[in-house]
UniProtKB/Swiss-Prot annotation:
Keywords: Amino-acid biosynthesis, Aromatic amino acid biosynthesis, Lyase, Pyridoxal phosphate, Tryptophan biosynthesis. It is an enzyme of class 4 (lyase). The modification N6-(pyridoxal phosphate)lysine is found at residue 86. This is Tryptophan synthase beta chain. Pathway: Amino-acid biosynthesis; L-tryptophan biosynthesis; L-tryptophan from chorismate: step 5/5.
Length: 407
């Protein structure tokens, strides 16, 4: 028996080998006790305030909105120490690990942001740190790999499968099954087996709680919609959690449409997946006709995940949240637009949410307040974007030469 409900409607659960059940139950017990312990909460809040830099700003954009009727606010998780929302829940889980007497942390990472956050928390709290990362992601996120190593983490490239986030998740889980007596698996998103989706949501919910307080101070009312990108779904559930009971506020998650939803090159399981079992949970999954897990794709490594957290699946099924998608090209355009119009370089992940917000703003016919969760900063993505833009410029120049040669 679990102390907390392991399901969100039909989604969630604990689909893990029997060997991991004691570890998950120990984690759940520690979490429930910590939530009732004032000393734990005080230490966590102190770290968030005096180490990570909370509360983060809620910034009203000056030039981003294409429509005078629409105000677009950004919740500035990019300003958090570590550069993304990941730091919030990592500090919470690292404190939990210490509470359980663990000496070592195992983690997985895609874009490297969760790895960096884990490495900084381990350095701060004197824990050994091991990070599994898909070999492809190691290549495309070299600045973050160096950051992790600089802070004392061991980064292990994963070459199995598609060499991306899902394979890193599998390897991390495999390692944990043989070492949970001394190690804690610090999962990086609101997915996986219970109690991880609940733990991650609770350690991220200050995003929405702060946003609610800040927007009421600024506008005297709640926003019409809050918008966040969705890979596994931790930044989005952190933003949504405090608004779920506010029926007037639309909750909008934006999945990566990659090269297009009508192609196999996307990462949008909520809209285009089938329910299956993966990574210890029942959730929407990108699967082929044989039920095998398909490779997901996104320009942003942090959204390149073939499934999604169970609470998002439940929010979609009940209609409380809607899930849209943005293509690579739309995210790239939004990435450049925010940089040019506001002097803020967003993570490519966050740019998916921005792209959809701008689209919503264009279509609005009445006064509207939108809040976008700017989940991370884009330093890690500048080389990826530069390469793509240079390549496009070259092919455009080549095309123009070809056309002028045909005149």
């Amino acid at each position: 028996m679990t102390k907390l409900d392991p399901y969100f409607g039909e989604y969630g659960g604990m689909y893990v080998p029997q060997i991991l059940m004691p570890a998950l139950k120990q984690l759940e017990t520690a979490f429930v006790e910590a939530q009732e312990d004032e000393a734990f909460k005080t230490e966590f809040n102190d770290l968030l305030k005096n180490y990570a830099g909370r509360p983060t700003a809620l910034t009203l954009t000056r030039n981003l909105s294409p429509n005078p009727l629409v105000k677009i606010y950004l919740k500035r998780e990019d300003l958090l120490h570590g550069g993304a929302h990941k730091t919030n829940q990592v500090l919470g889980q690292a404190l939990l690990a210490k509470r359980m007497g663990k000496k070592e942390i195992i983690a997985e990472t895609g874009a490297g942001q969760h790895g960096v956050a884990t490495a900084l928390a381990c350095a701060l709290l004197d824990l050994k740190c091991k990070v599994y990362m898909g070999a492809k992601d190691v290549e495309r996120q070299s600045p973050n790999v160096f950051r992790m190593k600089l802070m004392g983490a061991e980064v292990i490239p994963v070459t199995s499968g598609s060499s991306t986030l899902k394979d890193a998740c599998n390897e991390a889980m495999r390692d944990w099954s043989g070492s949970y007596d001394k190690a804690h698996y610090l999962l990086g998103t609101a997915a996986g087996p219970h109690p991880f989706p609940t733990i991650v949501r609770e350690f991220q919910r200050m995003i929405g709680a702060e946003t609610k307080k800040q927007i009421l101070e600024r506008e005297g009312r709640l926003p019409d919609a809050v918008i966040a990108c969705v890979g596994g779904g931790s930044n989005a559930i952190g933003m949504f959690a405090d608004f779920i009971d506010e029926e007037s506020v639309k909750l909008i998650g934006v999945e990566p449409a990659g090269l297009g939803i009508d192609t196999p090159m996307h990462g949008a399981p909520l809209k285009h997946g089938k329910t299956g079992i993966f990574f210890g949970m029942k959730a929407p999954l990108m699967q082929d006709r044989e039920g095998q897990i398909e490779e997901s794709y996104s320009i942003s490594a942090g959204l390149d995940f073939p499934s999604v957290g169970p609470q998002h699946a439940h929010l979609a099924a009940t209609g409380r949240a809607t899930y849209e998608s943005a293509t690579d090209d739309e995210a790239l355009e939004a990435f450049q637009l925010l940089a040019r119009s506001e002097g803020i370089i967003p993570a490519l992940e966050s740019a998916h949410a921005l792209a959809y917000a701008v689209k919503m703003a264009k279509a609005a016919t009445q006064e509207t307040i939108l809040v976008v969760n700017l989940s991370g900063r884009g330093d890690k993505d500048i080389f990826t974007v530069a390469d793509i833009l240079e390549e496009r410029e070259r092919s455009q120049t080549g095309q123009q030469k070809e056309e002028s040669g045909n005149d």
